[in-house]
Amino acid sequence: MTPATKLPQDVGPIHFVGIGGIGMSGIAEVLLNLGYRVQGSDLKGSKITERLAGLGAEIFEGQRAENLDGAAVVVISSAIKPGNPELDGARAQGLPVVRRADMLAELMRLKSNIAIAGTHGKTTTTTMMAELMVAGGFDPTVINGGIIHAYSSNARMGQGEWMVVEADESDGSFNRLPATVAIVTNIDPEHMEHWGSIEALRQGFYDFVSNIPFYGIAVCCTDHAEVQALVGRITDRRVRTYGFNAQADVRATNLTYKGGVAHFDILLQHEDMVIEGCTLPMPGDHNVSNALSAVAVARHLGMKADEIRAALAAFGGVNRRFTKVGEVNGVTIIDDYGHHPVEIAAVLKAARQASEGRVIAVHQPHRYSRLSNLFDDFCACFNEADVVAIAEVYAAGEAPIPGADRDALVAGLIRHGHRHARAILSEEDLERLVREQTRPGDMVVCLGAGTISAWANGLPDRLKG
C-alpha cells in the first residue's frame, strides 16, 4: 500500500470528463504510464483520444451517466458545469469529484516540481524547460498545455526526480499546485470573468509564488511592470530575475536575428559569467525571454553552459506556437495560438523579424467578452502587419455583445490608423486574399484559439489547387 499522502495505486478507475482536452489528456497520459487505470469521455474522438486508447485508456464518445459504471473517482475541468450528465451522475452516486488542478497536484506530490505561470508564454516556456532538463540528464516528467513537437504529445513520462508543469491561472486553481520552483513570465488582465479585478489577479500570482517551500526559488521576468511589482512584494523566499533590462540576474545581450533564428549571449549577473553564442531556432523577443527563464532554472539546478547552449539550439517548438504549416510559391504560412492583444503584437513582431517580405495577419477573435473588454488593445496590436483580415468571432459558447464583432473590429482598426484591414467570411475568402495580396517572401500568420487553425493547415493545399 502506498503512503496515505500519495495517490493509491489501487484507487480504481479514474474517469476524466473531457479526456481529450489539452489540459486533461496530459494528466491522463502520465497516470496511465504510472500504472493507474484510466477511462474518460469526450464529445468526439481525436488524435489525442486515440493516443490515450493506445496507452490503455477506455474512451467513451459522448457524455452519459452510464459511462461512469465502475469508476472510483471523476476528474473535471473548470469547463464542466452542473448539468453535465457525467458530473451530475457522479454526484448522484456519491463518487469523489476532483478538479483537474487537484489531480495534477496529486501527481506533483510524487516529484520535485517546476511550475510555469503567466498570462502568456506558459506553454512555450514549459517546453523549453523540459527540453533543457532532458539535455541536462534530468529525465523529467512533463505535463504541458500544448503538443510538444519533440514528443508529439503534451506529456512526457520520465524516470527522474523532477516534474515540469504548465500552471493555468484561468480559474485560480494554480495556487493548489505544490511547486518547488515557480516561474512567472508576465501578468496581464485576462480571464477576468474569474478574477473580477486586477487586484485579485495580482494576489493570485502572489499566492502562487508564496506557496513555494523555503528551499525553492521564484524566477520572474522583471521586463514586465506587474511582475516587477510582484517581486517587490515577495519576502522570505529566494527570487531570481530575468529579462532584457540591465538589472535582471539572467539577461539577454547582443540579440540579432538571421533567417528567423535568434542569436544572443546570456549574461548571468549573479554568477559574473556569460554564456556566449546562444541560438534559438525561432524568431521573437518574447521567445528569447521565455528561454531566459528556463536557463535561470537550469543554472539553479547545475546545468553546464555547453549543455544549455546545445539544448537551446536544438529546440523543436510547440504546436500552434509560430508553427510553419507550409510554403507555397515562396509564401510562408504560419499557425499560431495567439488570441490576446499582447500575444498578437509579439507574434507579429516575430513575423516581421523572420519575413523577407510583407506580413499578412489573419485573426479569428476568441470570445465576444475578450474582444469587448480589450477592444482598444485589439485595435492597436496589428501594427506590424501590412494587411489584416478579421474572421467572424469564435464564440466559445458566448452570446454576441453589441459593438464587439468582426465588423466592429475591422472598423476599429481602420479608425485607429491601420492602412489595410478587411473582413473575411470563409476559407474561400482567405484563399482569395492570399492569392491577391502575397508575393514571394511574404508571410501569412493565422492567429486565434478557435477554428482558425484548421484554416491555416488547409491553406497550403488550397493554394496549390
Swiss-Prot record:
Class of this enzyme: ligase
UniProt key word Cell division: yes
This protein's UniProt keywords: ATP-binding, Cell cycle, Cell division, Cell shape, Cell wall biogenesis/degradation, Cytoplasm, Ligase, Nucleotide-binding, Peptidoglycan synthesis
Subcellular location as annotated: Cytoplasm
Disulfide bond entries: none
Signal peptide location: none
Alphabetical GO biological process terms: cell division; cell wall organization; peptidoglycan biosynthetic process; regulation of cell shape
Catalytic activity of the protein: UDP-N-acetyl-alpha-D-muramate + L-alanine + ATP = UDP-N-acetyl-alpha-D-muramoyl-L-alanine + ADP + phosphate + H(+)
EC number of this enzyme: 6.3.2.8
GO cellular component: cytoplasm
Pathway field: Cell wall biogenesis; peptidoglycan biosynthesis
UniProt-recorded Gene Ontology molecular function terms: ATP binding; UDP-N-acetylmuramate-L-alanine ligase activity
Positions contributing to ATP binding: G118, T119, H120, G121, K122, T123, T124
Physiological role: Cell wall formation.
UniProt similarity note: Belongs to the MurCDEF family.
Protein name: UDP-N-acetylmuramate--L-alanine ligase
Species, as recorded: Ruegeria pomeroyi (strain ATCC 700808 / DSM 15171 / DSS-3) (Silicibacter pomeroyi)
Highest classification ranks of the organism: Bacteria, Pseudomonadati, Pseudomonadota, Alphaproteobacteria, Rhodobacterales
